């Protein structure tokens, strides 16, 4: 069946649309009271991810509230390292942690490469359940963390401020780091292809920590592996193109090389001006972004003003997907998200047609 709303797919292909499409990173999440209620039913965060019906429910919640142009699979970027038997757990207020770390060539060699269909079948069950529930209303976005970003969590044992263990391995034993990234690139390719086969119509690679690298290190240890993944992905499924979005937080200085990766779109955080990004790479890729999520803590008028500024910065014509520059904060007022979406719907049509 054709999609009732293919606005996002058209924008990613840089084809004309009637208004700028919008979705939000972490649009299903803790800022919504209904999410908190469902999370309470599930028990732990990973129990929520592993229950296809509940993962579907929280995926659908923001679409019931807001006129969004896509659903994004409710899951976590750390499902792959979890399937590598590193013992993922969540500390209240501290985020994800691993019971085991990977800090040597021997530890890298010992890592199993998961089979996505077998070891991450709960994710594919969620994708299938969500696609059925969506009933072709809007497209479903699947996702993964990038190899470099996954590696940082596996080496550090959780999130980090300085990434000293990851960078020590990268500079001190680059062969071991490349071996780890190679395993992860193969795993991510398999994982995203399994999501596409299960029904994901768009995929995004989240390179949350690529921006902490030097330019040569970014190209060698992050972007090269994302480009390899893009090359290995299923790009046609269910009779249509499957777009790929790459998002490196704080990666605006590398737009040209990211645009050469083979991806259809590049995600931007709020530190890169859209007009500048469009002038540099807008003839090659669509651009996604880039409202600072903290703008949503301001008044509805201030939110509207910033939406207007970003739309004007991109300018007229296709190729822009409106999003936040990072995930929506758990402390955001849902009514302020509504003000954001309403402002976009009201203001963006003048830039199209």
Curated annotation (Swiss-Prot):
Binding site for substrate: 26-30, 76, 153, 208, 326
CDD domains per UniProt: URO-D
Catalysed reactions, semicolon-separated: uroporphyrinogen III + 4 H(+) = coproporphyrinogen III + 4 CO2
PROSITE patterns: UROD_1, UROD_2
Cellular component annotations (GO), alphabetically ordered: cytosol
Family annotation (InterPro entries): UROD/MetE-like_sf, Uroporphyrinogen_deCO2ase_HemE, Uroporphyrinogen_deCOase
Main localization (coarse): cytoplasm
Localisation: Cytoplasm
Enzyme class: lyase
Coiled-coil regions listed: none
Superkingdom of this protein's organism: Bacteria
Subunit architecture: Homodimer.
The protein's name: Uroporphyrinogen decarboxylase
Source lineage: Bacteria, Pseudomonadati, Pseudomonadota, Gammaproteobacteria, Oceanospirillales
């Amino acid at each position: 069946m054709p999609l009732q709303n293919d606005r996002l797919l058209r924008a990613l292909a840089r084809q004309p649309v009637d208004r700028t499409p919008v979705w939000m990173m972490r649009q299903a999440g803790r800022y919504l009271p209904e999410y908190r209620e469902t999370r309470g039913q599930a028990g732990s965060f990973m129990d929520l991810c592993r229950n296809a019906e509940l993962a579907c429910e929280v995926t659908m919640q923001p679409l019931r509230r807001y006129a969004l142009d896509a659903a994004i699979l409710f899951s976590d970027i750390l499902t792959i390292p979890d399937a590598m038997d590193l013992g993922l757990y969540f500390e209240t207020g501290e985020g994800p942690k691993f019971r085991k770390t990977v800090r040597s060539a021997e530890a890298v060699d010992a890592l199993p490469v998961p089979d996505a269909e077998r070891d991450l079948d709960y994710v594919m069950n969620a994708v299938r359940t969500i696609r059925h529930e969506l009933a072709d209303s809007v497209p479903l976005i699947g996702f993964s963390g990038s190899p470099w970003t996954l590696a940082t969590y596996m080496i550090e044992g959780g999130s980090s401020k300085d990434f000293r263990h990851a960078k020590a391995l990268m500079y001190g034993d680059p062969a071991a780091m490349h071996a780890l990234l190679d395993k992860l690139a193969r795993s991510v390719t398999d994982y995203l292809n399994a999501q596409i086969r299960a029904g994901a119509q768009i995929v995004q690679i989240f390179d949350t920590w690529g921006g902490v690298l030097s330019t040569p290190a970014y190209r060698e240890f992050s972007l090269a592996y994302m480009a390899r993944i893009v090359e290995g992905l299923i790009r046609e499924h269910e009779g249509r193109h499957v777009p790929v979005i790459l998002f490196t937080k704080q990666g605006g200085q590398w737009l040209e090389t990211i645009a050469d990766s083979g991806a259809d779109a590049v995600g931007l955080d709020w530190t890169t001006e859209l007009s500048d990004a469009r002038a540099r790479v807008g003839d090659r890729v669509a651009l996604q972004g880039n409202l600072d999520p903290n703008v949503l803590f301001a008044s509805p008028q201030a939110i509207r003003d910033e939406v207007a500024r970003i739309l004007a910065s991109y300018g007229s014509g296709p190729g822009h997907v409106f999003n936040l520059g990072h995930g929506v904060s758990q402390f955001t007022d849902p009514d302020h998200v509504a003000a954001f979406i309403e402002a976009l719907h009201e203001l963006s049509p003048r830039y199209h047609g």
